[in-house]
Structure formats: structure tokens, C-alpha cells
Amino acid sequence: MARYYNIFTQVQLQTAPEMGVPLPPGDEERYRLTGYNYWFGKLGQAQIGPIYLGWLGVASLLFGFLAIEIIGLNMLASVNWSPIAFVREFFWLSLDPPGPEWGFSPFVPLAQGGWWILAGFFLTLSILLWWVRSYRRAKSLGMGLHVCWAFASAIWLYLVIGFIRPFLMGSWSESVPFGIFPHLDWTNNFSLIHGNLFYNPFHALSIAFLYGSALLFAMHGATILAVSRYGGEREIEQITDRGTASERAGLFWRWTMGFNATMESIHRWAWWFAVLTTLTGGIGILLSGTVVENWYLWAQQHQYAPGG
């Protein structure tokens, strides 16, 4: 007799841990640190591990730790090493890039922005090593490289903001500080300086893809949950014995918007929308100040804004 399980009624089985497919010759062994967590099982797979780091993973974590350590200690020093003030003012604390007087020189005194350069260097190295690790793990498992290229799109935006655009502008001061509210302040000031990013067509595309990603994610998630009582979340069963879940989901969207995605195409749509969010966003940031000084005036000249 078929039973319907969802997040509230599912049964968690704990057996011998699944260690994954065999590794190719020359790869290090996975760390056999495994276990089960009840609450992880409520949200996804209850099994923890096995973990595979390799030298790339270890190096990435090490450089990431150094970056966070530099940022954290500088923030702590800015409140006179007071743990209470650090916690109270955490969202307002920052580690700022060098001032405009230093240009794009890598040789800046630590107290005047050198710490920011060091933290950025270690953080960038950590991110790039993690990307290489994700690429190698995907190749090792015989997977496609979709995750790697999506991650690369996010790295593109990060590099544009922190390195490529400041390099083209000739000043580290064009980059973003480390910090939560200071980062938001930088974003607001950046928009004001360059005549309102709302008139930047690549920014508009980025926002459209961002909202589109949220919409696609909500539509896909809601559809699968709506037909999970018919086994809609079990993709293997849907391929080999379709039952009624796929038909009902497809029919619902044909009724409501005229056509429906397939089990494959919805993921391709979501992937492209997510990738294009950061890709177009990076292009919009890169063009600001280097090619277009004031986006509002540019929009007027091209009949994109009123008053043109």
C-alpha cells in the first residue's frame, strides 16, 4: 500500500552510511566522518559526510580563515578591543579600502588600507581555490559543470566590484568596504554618484533576472510540493512510472498560463536566470564610471528617461 510522506510525516531510516561512488585513482580518500542528524533529516538528507577536502579544500579554508581573522581583528581594534562594543556595533563596523591618495598601489601601510588589501587577497584566493575544487570534484564524479559556472558568475561580480573596476579606475578607494551596513552605504553612494543605477540597463536586467529567479523558484517549489502526494518529488519514479503527478502539474500550468515547463527545462530556466543575475550585474557595475559617468544623463540622451 502506498503511503504519502511529507516534511511532517516522513520516517527517517538510519543505516550504514552511504560513502558515495568510488574515487578515481590518485585521489585522496574521503574523510570517514559520518553521522546522522535528526533536524538535518527534517530539512533534507539526514546523513552527514563523508567529507572530501583534499589540499585545495584545506588551502581554501585556511586562506578564508586568514581573511576573516584580519577583518574581525581590525573591527575589534576599531572599538578599542571591547567585546561588548564589538557585538553591539557589529553591523556598523567596517574594514575600509585605501584612500584615493594611494591610487591602485599594492604597497599601502597596513593602518591606511593595507589590511583591507591583505584581507581581500586572502579572501579572493580562498574563493578561487574553492572554485577549482568544485570543478575538480564535478569532473571526478562525472557530473556536468553547471554548478561551477554558476559559481563563476557570482565570482565575476565579486571581482568586478573588488578588483577589476578599481583597477580600471586607478584607485582602491572605488572598491567596497568589508562590513554589513558600510557595504549597503557603499551601494547607495555608488548609485548616487553615477546618476541612479535604476537607469543602468544592465542593472535593470540584473534585477529582472533576480526577481525572475525568485518567481521560478517559488513556482517550481510550489508545484512539486503540490503534487508530492502523488510522488511528484521522486524523480526516478516520475521517469519510469509517471503516474499522475507530472500530468497534474503540467495540466495546472497549461490551465493557468497556457503552457508548462518540463521536469528538465524548469531547472534550465532557473539556472540561466540565476547566472544572468550576477553576470549582468557585474557588467552594469563595470561600465559605471569607466564608460558611463552618469546613468540618468545617459538615459536621457538615449530616450530611456524623461527629459531626453
Give residue spans per PLM region.
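Hydrophobic alpha-helical transmembrane segments
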Residues: G99-G120, D185-L215
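N-terminal juxtamembrane cytosolic/stromal segments of multi-pass membrane proteins
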Residues: M1-A59, P83-P98, L251-T256
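Juxtamembrane/interface segments at transmembrane-helix termini
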Residues: A2, G72-N80, W131-G144, F163-V176, ...
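Final/C-terminal transmembrane alpha-helix of multipass membrane proteins
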Residues: E264-E293
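Hydrophobic alpha-helical membrane-insertion segments
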Residues: G57-M75, V147-M169, A208-L215, L276-I285
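Cytoplasmic membrane-interface regions of multi-pass membrane proteins
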Residues: L33-G44, V79-G103, F122-C148, A218-I266
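Membrane-interfacial helical/loop segments at transmembrane boundaries in membrane proteins
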Residues: M75-P106, F163-F198, I236-W255, N294-G308
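Alpha-helical transmembrane segments and their helix-start/interface "positive-inside/aromatic belt" motifs
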Residues: G41-F63, Y135-W156, A204, E264-V275
